[in-house]
Amino acid sequence: MVFFDSVLKKKCEFIPHEAKKANIYLCGPTVYDDAHLGHARSSVCFDFLRRVLLASGYEVVFARNYTDIDDKILKKMQESGKSLKEITNFYIKRYEEDMQALNILEPDFKPKATAYIEQMITYIEKLLELNLAYKLEDGIYFDTSKDDKYFYISKRNLEDNQSRLEESVAKKNDSDFVLWKFDEKFYPASFGKGRPGWHTECVVMIESIFKDKLDIHAGGIDLLFPHHENEACQCRCKNNHELANFWLHNGFVQINGEKMSKSLGNSFFLKDSLKLFNGEVLRFYLLSVHYRAHFNYALEDLQAAKKRLDKFYRLKKRLNLNAFIDEKTIIESKVSQNILDVLNDDLNASKALALLDEFINESNIYLDQNPKDKAYKIQLEKTLKELSFIFGIGFIDTIKYFQFGISEEKCQEIEEKITLRNKAKQEKNYVLADQIRDDLAKENILLMDTPNGVVWEKNG
C-alpha cells in the first residue's frame, strides 16, 4: 500500500507505527456556518481512505475535530447575539447531518477545541519554559527561529507567503504565529486570560488522542501552510519528533476553473447540492476525481455521476436487494480484491471506478444469458455488499433511490393515480389505464408493472 506524502512529494509505502493499525487525524470544520463543497470533498476523500484501510484488514482509529472557538465564530456571535455554544452546537448538528447524507463513517473521536483548553494551557506553558515562545501585548507567540526545519512540511518560503502570515508589528520573526490571544472574556491561564490559537488547538488534540503515534495527518491542501506547518513546528520543537508519519492532502474544489472560496463569492453550501441530488450521488461524484487533483464542480458532471451510480442501483434492483447496512465487510471476492489492489496505489479511484463499471456491465450480460443461476446471484450479492462498503454507496432503499426529489405530496398524488390505473385495468378500461401512465410519463414519472405490483421512479 502506497500513498503520496505531501512532505516528501512522492509515493511512499505506508508503514504505520503498529502493524495493521492506522491512526488518522483529519482537520475538521470551523463551526460558524454550514458546510460547503470543500468540506464535503475532504470528508469523502478521507472517509474513502478509511474504508480502503478497513477493507484491507487494518484497524483504524479516526479522529476529526471541531474548531469551536475562533475569530469567525466570535464575529458570528456579535452579528447574531447568540452565545458561543448556541452557534457551535447548531452548526455541528447541521454538519453531522450532511456527513450522514454522504455516508461518512462516524469518527472514533470528534474532539472539540473547547474541551481541551486545560491541555492547551499546559502545552503553551511548556513551550514558554523551553524558551520556544514569548509574550507580547496581544498574546503568546511561537518563535519560529528556534525551528531549523520550519517550512519543511510545506516547502514554502517566507517571501511567497506574506499574505498568509499573522500580523503583529512586534513579532520577532515574520513567520512567528500566535499560540494564545489575550482576551479578558475567556479562559484564565498563568500567562494571562485569553483563548488558544488555531494551530495550537489541533496539535494539542492530536497529541492528547494519539500521543506520539499519529500515522496519517489529512486535510485540504489549503491547510498545508500555515496551519499544518505550524502544528508540525510546535510538536517538533517540543517533543523532538515529527507530528505524523504521513501527510495527505486533497486538492481544491473549483467552480468554473476558479478556487471555491467565500471571498470570491463562488462558494455554496453542501445543503444546496443535497436538495438536487441525494448524498450518495454527490459522494460518487466527488470520488470520480483523484483526491490530490483539483476538482472542478460542474452540474453536468454531477448528472453524469448520477447516471453512473444508477447502474449500480439497477443491478441491485434486478436482484431484488434491499438497502445494504454500512458495516465493515470481509473482502473475499476476486472483483473486490482487484479493486482494492488498485486503490492501494494512492487511492486510484478513477481506475477503481472503471473496474466497477466493467463489473456491473459483465454482471448484467451474464444475468441476461443465465437468469436462473442462483449460485451466481448469491455470490453477486456478496460482492455488491463488499463494493458498497469500499465505495460508501448502496445504502439507500432501491425504490427510494429512484424516487429522490419527489415531494411527499407529489408521492401521494402518484400513488392515487396508480390506484386509479389499477382499478381501470381491473375494469378492462385499458384506454384510461394507458392515459394515466402516459400522463405521468409526461411528468417524468415512469410506471413499471412487476410481479409484486406497480413501482414507479423519477426519470432523470
From Swiss-Prot:
It comes from the Bacteria. The keyword Metal-binding applies. GO terms for cellular component: cytosol. One of its GO terms (molecular function) is cysteine-tRNA ligase activity. It catalyses: tRNA(Cys) + L-cysteine + ATP = L-cysteinyl-tRNA(Cys) + AMP + diphosphate. Keywords: Aminoacyl-tRNA synthetase, ATP-binding, Cytoplasm, Ligase, Metal-binding, Nucleotide-binding, Protein biosynthesis, Zinc. This is Cysteine--tRNA ligase. The lineage of its organism: Bacteria, Pseudomonadati, Campylobacterota, Epsilonproteobacteria, Campylobacterales.
